C-alpha cells in the first residue's frame, strides 16, 4: 500500500492538474501517466546503457544520438517555456511514434493520445512533482499506479473495481504461470494481472529468455488483455511496455459480445471481471447464454472463461459472494457447469474490506480447470480473515495476513485431507456440494465450535440480587440520616 509521503506528493500533483483546469479524473490519470512513462523510459534507457558499459557491448537505445534532448533528465531542468515546446512538439510525438514499425498494441492505442497540459508553468510544476517521486523499486511504482487509479471516480459505475496488487500476486502465485502459457485477462483495466504474471515468469523462469522461441512467445503471443475503455488500454499498453513486454495482444473488445469469437484458445485466465453490470440479451454472445441465460456480467464472464480456455486450461477469477449461493436458475446453472462438467479445485473466501475504500463487496476466488468432462472430486475451501491490511477505509498495514498460509496450504493439498470443518481450510466432497444445490459459500460447510458456558443456578442469582437490594436499602437509610 502507498506510503503517506508518496500519497501526499501525488495529491499535490493532482491538485496542480485540477487548478490548471484538467478536472476529469480519467484525463488527469492519462496525462499523469504520459509524463511518468516519459520519465521511466529515460530511467530504463539509463539502466540498459550502464549494463552495456559493464558488459563491454554496444547498445543501440530508443533515443537516437540526435534526440538525447528528449530524455527526461535532459529537459526537466530547462526553463518552463523551452521545456513546454520540447515536450509538446518533440517528446510527445516521439512517445506516440514508438513501436510504429509494427502493428503493436502500444502504437494502436497511442495514435489518438492528446497532450492536454495547457501552459508552460503548469507543465513545469507537474514535471518537478513527478521528478521528486521516489520510485526506486517496482513496489513503489505499483503503489503509485494503484493510488492513481483509485482516484477515478467513475471506476465502479460499471462494476469494475481495481484489484489490490497483493491479491493479484497471490492469485498468480497460486496459478504458477509457465513459459508456454497463453494468458488472458478478459477485463484487463490497467493490466495488473498481466504485469504480475510476467514478473512471476521473470522471477521463476528467467531461463526462458535464453530460448529464442520462448522469448518470442513472451513478447508477442503470451499475454492478451481485452477492455472497452481506450484510456485503460493506453495505460495498460504503457504498463506492459515499461515492464519489458514488447508487444502484448491488447485489444479494444467487448468480451461478452458476438464480436469476441475466442474459443479453446488460452491456458490461463486471471481476472476480476465487472460485478455490477447488467446487459441486454441482444448484447451478449448467444453461446454464452446457452450456458447460463442471464443479464448479470459476473455470471456471463464465468461462461466466457469456460469457452475461451483450452481443455486443461486453468482459471483464477474473483467473483462476488452472490455467485456462490445465488438461488436463480442462472446462478445454479453456472455453478453446476463448473462443478459437473469441469474441475472446481478451490473457493477462497475473502473479507469484504479487501476492496475498501472503493467497494465494500464480499468476494471469493474461484480456481478451476476446464476439462469438458468433469473431474471435480473434493473442493478446497479457505476462509481468509486478513490480508495484511486493516479492513476499514484506511487499509493500514497490520500483522495479520493469511496470504502466505493460503499459498502454502494450496501447494500441499495432501495435508488438507484430515482438516476439520472447524479449521480455516478444509476439503468438501463433490457429492455434498451437489446435495446442497451446488452452494459454494464456505459458511454452508464450515462448522463452528461453541464453548459451553456455565451459568450460576437460579437460586444463587436470586440470593445475590437480594443481598444487593439489602445493601442499597442500607445505603439509602444512611443517606436519609445525614439529611
Regions found by a protein language model. Name each.
Residues 42, 190, 230-231, 257, ...:
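Conserved nucleotide-binding/hydrolysis micro-motifs of P-loop NTPases
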Residues 11, 124, 216, 246-250, ...:
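Short acidic (Asp/Glu) and glycine-rich catalytic loops that position anionic groups and cofactors
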Residues 1-179, 249-260, 349-353, 375-390, ...:
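Non-catalytic, mostly N-terminal accessory regions of nucleic-acid modification and defense proteins
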Residues 343-344, 356-406:
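C-terminal, active-site-flanking charged/polar segments
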Residues 157-271, 276-278, 287, 295, ...:
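Conserved S-adenosyl-L-methionine
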Residues 28, 228-233, 250, 295-368:
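Conserved Class I SAM-dependent methyltransferase catalytic core
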Residues 23, 280-296, 322-330, 351-358, ...:
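Short, contiguous acidic/charged loop-to-helix segments that flank catalytic cores in large enzymes
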